[in-house]
Amino acid sequence: MQNSPVPVIETPPQAPTVTVARAHQDFGPLAVFQRIAAAHDTTPLQVVRDYASLAFGPGRVSFNDYVRLRLFDRLHWNGCDLRTVAGQRHNRELVVAINYRHDWYGVVTDKIASTSYLSAFGLPTIPVTALYAPRLTRASSLALRARDDLRKFLMRDDVYPLFGKPAEGFQSLGSIALRRPLPESDELEKIGGGRIGLEAFLDDIMQHYAGGYLFQPFVAPHPQAAALFGERLGTARIITLVEDGVPRIFRAAWKIPSGENLADNYWRSGNLLAKIDIDTGEIERVVSGAGFEAAFKTHHPDTGVCFAGVALPQWEEMKVVALEAARVMHHMPMIGWDMGPTSAGPVIVEMNETPDFFLNQFADARGVLEPDFMRFVAAQKRAAKDHETRMKSDIAKL
């Protein structure tokens, strides 16, 4: 008598404990042209012409840029010359040309290096509590080399609350805010609610972030900011330019977290983006979403606080810190600083060597390709050629 085959029970894959990738939305042109035409009392052909004029214009806007930035909506852009709006690809081309000292990219892209470098100059950063670094062969007080080291660290009450993120990540992917360990259930409690399994979290770090994962103290927001959006840090994206050694603030916007989001990145559904007055830090308007989902907001959806009359706390101090940080990083003439207001003063969370113009263009309803900025770009291209000439001359002398 043959034994019946044992049925195979397939276990569905477990969702990651952290967001390891963001979803990308590609828009089908024909349906989108028809939708835009119907909503704006025009024809699909006219929408095609409008898009083509921007696609072949100075900003080289892609179709996804056209929809995501809502460039079909003249009301959103409030009379702005849309030919000054830079598309995502041209955005990257411009920043790479401006920040021509590519030998400095490593300092900026590695969060350990950037935090250490800025703090050495006395700038306010968030210290590193521990670092998962499996490639190391020698232990230290900060470096966690093995899974068991990481497990023991995460079970320590004295290191919490914690914020974790990849050492070389971007857009807050892989980040998490943890309130405390729960040893009785082998879990970790998240700030903002919910729990995750410790072993599942370790699995995700091992699988996705073998290059390094760091932990920092969780920084609470300034009380005025907390009253607006709760126990999470909403950072200002401040873009600085440095020309002839002199820094200036180019653009600024306030990223406001909402819903279940602990991270303030605007791509996360529900988060808000505020246009602010650079002189005063006062909110001028707030938008959520992008493309067809974009909508203006007058109150925070969680707290109900009205945005009218609200200013970014510690704005004057933030500007001072941003300009000083730009002086320190003068080798990179354009940096997007993420800075948050806390009860202890403004703190630099990250610096971005290829800042995404989407945030500031969409918040301000104003393109970046204006005459003053293009003059700056031209000056940096000349500086890049001079730098290359000097390097070749130095090599020739060897």
Regions found by a protein language model. Give the residues of each.
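Intrinsically disordered, low-structural-confidence terminal and linker regions
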Residues: 1-36
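Conserved N-proximal alpha/beta basic substrate-recognition cap immediately N-terminal to
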Residues: 24-156, 169-170, 322
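Active-site nucleotide/adenylate-binding loops and adjacent lid/helix of ATP-dependent enzymes
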Residues: 111-236
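Short, flexible loop/turn elements at secondary-structure junctions
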Residues: 132, 166-168, 182, 217-219, ...
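Protein kinase-like catalytic core scaffold
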Residues: 162, 248, 347-349
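Glycine-rich phosphate/pyrophosphate-binding beta-alpha loops
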Residues: 172, 235, 255-261, 352-364
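A long amphipathic alpha-helix within ATP-dependent nucleotide-binding catalytic cores
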Residues: 203-231, 240-243, 249-251, 255-342
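C-terminal active-site "lid" helix and adjoining low-complexity regulatory extension at the edge
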Residues: 294-323, 327-332, 341-398
